Amino acid sequence: MRDSVIDIRGLDRVQRARVQAKEEAPKRWSVDDIVALFELPFSDLMHRAQSVHRENFDPNGVQVSTLLSIKTGGCSEDCGYCPQAARYHTDVEKQDLMQLEEVLAAARAAKENGASRFCMGAAWRSPKQRDLEPVLAMIREVKAMGLETCATLGMLKDGQAEQLKEAGLDYYNHNLDTAPEYYGEVITTRTYQDRLDTLDRVREQDINVCCGGIIGMGESRVQRAGLLAQLANMERPPESVPINLLTQVEGTPMYGMDELDPFEFVRTIAAARITMPQSFVRLSAGRQSMHEGIQALCFLAGANSIFYGEKLLTTGNPEAEADRKLFDKLGIHPL
């Protein structure tokens, strides 16, 4: 008996996308395609995501990073979610660029706690050359410890990506934050194209790209799908895709927004895994607010990278020991 074949010619765009979502990945993901993934029954979506995950990764392995804020607060941008913006009245205290030895001490502690990558974040719109020089020294010294290095420093000017590459930088983080259609609701001091231009400069130097977004900022499901479409359809999708859950900080414009349903966040992780099968999908900011059960569902949905211990820029993050206990419960091991 022949397997039944669905004739999709008479279906509308969304119906066709739903059928295709159950079958095979398109060469280029449309927003409709990704919305159709979101709309699958939860068990079907999880099965699809886990199947894709197992085809490309050790299903029980998770890459572990530690993120250190090497320069905090005082940023001139107006990102509506960010407590480091100088224009917002938050509890974040401005701190100048850390000294090299302070950073190296944090990197040693991260390595001892099982991290394989050390990420350095600075609250700049764009680094000045005089500020970049000490960061280059940090990258070289952390790299010499045997850790992978990552930096998030804001927009890069011509020539700066080359300097980062020469210093040995492995990853550069620069998020798109949200879909182009919703971007103006989040930030006005930097354009979407500015972000894409920085990513192009990073790619030109063959530095791995870490690029994702923030979920739960009031965007629609279609706009969440739009963010994933932007990422998945890049000429080379990001090697690392951080999916952040908005951490609401009093004093920022996005404080007091309706909280995202946890299962919608899990669906976002699953859709990211399906659309970017060879990328590491990082369960990033907001994890400290998640019940262990939701974190477990995120791992099942294809998340295979986390930030471990320390502080995630200016928001809390579960301590390393709590993470180890969760890994033990789930049979997960660090990569």
Curated annotation (Swiss-Prot):
The cofactors required by this protein are: [4Fe-4S] cluster; [2Fe-2S] cluster
Give EC number(s), comma-separated: 2.8.1.6
What note does UniProt attach to the cofactor annotation? Answer: Binds 1 [4Fe-4S] cluster. The cluster is coordinated with 3 cysteines and an exchangeable S-adenosyl-L-methionine.
Catalyses: (4R,5S)-dethiobiotin + (sulfur carrier)-SH + 2 reduced [2Fe-2S]-[ferredoxin] + 2 S-adenosyl-L-methionine = (sulfur carrier)-H + biotin + 2 5'-deoxyadenosine + 2 L-methionine + 2 oxidized [2Fe-2S]-[ferredoxin]
Q: What class of enzyme is it?
A: transferase
Q: Which residues bind [2Fe-2S] cluster?
A: C119, C150, C210, R282
Q: Which UniProt keywords apply?
A: 2Fe-2S, 4Fe-4S, Biotin biosynthesis, Iron, Iron-sulfur, Metal-binding, S-adenosyl-L-methionine, Transferase
The coiled-coil segments of this chain are none
User: What family is reported?
Assistant: Belongs to the radical SAM superfamily. Biotin synthase family.
Q: How does it assemble?
A: Homodimer.
Task performed by this protein:
Catalyzes the conversion of dethiobiotin (DTB) to biotin by the insertion of a sulfur atom into dethiobiotin via a radical-based mechanism.
What is the recorded name of this protein? Biotin synthase
Q: What is the lineage of its organism?
A: Bacteria, Pseudomonadati, Pseudomonadota, Betaproteobacteria, Nitrosomonadales
* Name of the encoding gene: bioB
